[in-house]
């Protein structure tokens, strides 16, 4: 009978010291707390924050761009080829516009009353 009484005292001791009842092994977000009452309020608050942060972490999947999500499917080569083709097309159009502008300046197609000092020509 003395053993049963001693076990009950050991189980109630953390509650008498002002500590909260926690699962054995620490559980999620466990931090050891001191026995004084001043640290218990901060411990409880931090425990809640840690649990909240862990619950929110899986919700960040929406922030991953689709290109990265599809990388595992073997579509990298196609995406890169499409990107390179777009870059070649942009460069071609840019060279065409620059050449057209330079030809207009050099051939004097602009009206004579315009001042050409502020214009420039980039030769490809």
Swiss-Prot record:
**So what family is this one in?**
Belongs to the BEX family.
What interactions and quaternary structure are annotated? Self-associates. Binds to the DEATH domain of p75NTR/NGFR. Interacts with 14-3-3 epsilon (YWHAE). Interacts with DIABLO/SMAC.
Residues reported in the UniProt entry to bind Zn(2+): 121
The effect of residue 121 to S is:
Abolished zinc-binding and association with FEM1B
Domain comment (free text): The nuclear export signal is required for export from the nucleus and the interactions with itself and NGFR/p75NTR. The histidine cluster (His cluster) and Cys-121 mediate zinc-binding.
The organism of origin for this protein: Mus musculus
A GO BP term, please? negative regulation of protein ubiquitination
Q: Where is this region: Interaction with 14-3-3 epsilon?
A: 81-124
Q: Where is the protein localized?
A: Nucleus; Cytoplasm, Cytosol
- Region feature (Interaction with p75NTR/NGFR): 81-106
| Entry protein name | Protein BEX3
Quote the biased-composition stretches of kind Basic residues, using this chain's numbering.
42-53
Region annotation (Disordered) maps to 1-56
Which Pfam families does the record match to this protein?
BEX
| PTM info | Ubiquitinated. Degraded by the proteasome.
- His cluster: annotated span: 113-117
InterPro entries the record matches: BEX, TF_A-like/BEX
* The entry's keywords: Apoptosis, Cytoplasm, Metal-binding, Nucleus, Ubl conjugation, Zinc
Q: Which GO terms describe its cellular component?
A: cytoplasm; cytosol; nucleus
- Where is motif Nuclear export signal found? 90-100
Which GO terms label this protein's molecular function in UniProt?
death receptor binding; identical protein binding; metal ion binding; molecular function inhibitor activity; nerve growth factor receptor binding
Q: What is its main location?
A: nucleus
Stated consequence of mutating residue 97 to A: Abolishes nuclear export and interactions with itself and p75NTR/NGFR
Function statement: May be a signaling adapter molecule involved in NGFR/p75NTR-mediated apoptosis induced by NGF. Plays a role in zinc-triggered neuronal death. In absence of reductive stress, acts as a pseudosubstrate for the CRL2(FEM1B) complex: associates with FEM1B via zinc, thereby preventing association between FEM1B and its substrates.
- Where does the entry say this protein is expressed, by tissue? Widely expressed.
């Amino acid at each position: 009978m003395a053993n049963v009484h001693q076990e009950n005292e050991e189980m109630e001791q953390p509650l008498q010291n002002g500590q909260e009842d926690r699962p054995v092994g620490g559980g999620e977000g466990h931090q050891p707390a001191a026995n004084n009452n001043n640290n218990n309020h901060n411990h409880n608050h931090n425990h809640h924050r840690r649990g909240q942060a862990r619950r929110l972490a899986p919700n960040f999947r929406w922030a991953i761009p689709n290109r990265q999500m599809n990388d595992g499917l073997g579509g990298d080569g196609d995406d890169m080829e499409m990107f390179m083709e777009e870059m070649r097309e942009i460069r071609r159009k840019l060279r065409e516009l620059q050449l057209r502008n330079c030809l207009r300046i050099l051939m004097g197609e602009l009206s004579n009353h315009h001042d050409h000092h502020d214009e420039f020509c980039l030769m490809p």
